[in-house]
A protein has these predicted regions:
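A domain-start/cap signature at the N-terminus of enzymes
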Residues: 1-22, 199
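Serine-hydrolase catalytic machinery in alpha/beta-hydrolase-like enzymes
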Residues: 9, 19-102
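The conserved beta1-alpha1 loop
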Residues: 25-28, 139, 167
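A conserved amphipathic alpha-helix that caps or lines the catalytic cleft of carbohydrate-
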Residues: 37-41, 125-126, 190
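Short beta-strand immediately N-terminal to the catalytic nucleophile in serine-hydrolase-like folds
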Residues: 109-114, 138
């Protein structure tokens, strides 16, 4: 279905009789819902409802503030995360909730998940809203300039219970000085936030684009258990 010009897909396990389930909101660059669900089943995750949102203006809507492009011919990072978050909270989630209720389900809580820049968006969002109890940031863009300072200078939502961080072990190998800081900054942010909420940092094999659905699924499984 289409809500606010975004493509929305909702997954339910029709064989599960639970009435109240966690709902995971996944902002994604491309449609992967079937791959992610397959991976979740393979690793025996707990039951949940997955909402995948695509057709996102990636560098515009997932970025918290403006920065210059990292590469030639790359779209600029325009810093419209606040505007998109408002649309997510006031337009998209209410419609999703209606759809869930029509299927005789209830929302236990909301979690927010993302990969790469949308992993950054998920973490940033809990400094702006109390909507989400859990965050899954798989290979998240923790390299983003000034992010570490923002996290230290602002207050995370008191509703947050856990945050999952992961990276590929080769992601720090980059000629770009900003991108090559991703592992160092991810670990620093995870360590800082571990004093406030339950966190984990998990390292996977490969670069940024390796087994993305599997990495998201691993984050979902951990989040549902923590």
């Amino acid at each position: 279905m289409i809500i606010a010009n975004k493509q929305i897909k909702i997954y339910y396990n029709d064989n599960d009789n639970s009435n109240t389930l966690p709902v995971i909101i996944l902002n994604n660059f491309e449609e992967q819902i079937n791959e992610i669900i397959t991976e979740c089943r393979h690793i025996n995750s707990k039951e949940f409802i997955l909402v995948e949102i695509t057709n996102i203006n990636w560098n515009k809507e997932m970025s918290p503030w403006k920065i210059t492009s990292l590469f030639k011919n790359e779209e600029p990072y325009l810093g419209n995360a606040d505007e998109y978050l408002k649309v997510l909270e006031t337009e998209i989630i209410p419609e999703i909730e209606k759809k869930i209720e029509k299927n005789n389900k209830k929302v236990k809580y909301y979690a927010i998940a993302g990969y790469s820049l949308s992993g950054l968006f998920g973490l940033y969002s809990v400094y702006k809203t109390d909507k989400f109890k859990k965050i899954i940031t798989a290979s998240g863009s923790m390299w983003y300039p000034n992010l570490e300072n923002y996290i230290k200078e602002n207050k995370i939502s008191s509703k947050v219970e856990s945050i999952y961080f992961s990276l590929g072990d080769k992601e720090k190998i980059s000629k770009n000085p900003i991108l090559k800081s991703v592992e160092e900054k991810t670990k620093l942010i995870q360590e800082y936030l571990s004093n406030k909420v339950k966190t984990i940092y998990e390292e996977n094999e490969g670069n940024h684009f390796n087994e993305t659905a599997k990495r998201i699924a691993k984050g979902i499984k951990w989040s549902l258990e923590n």
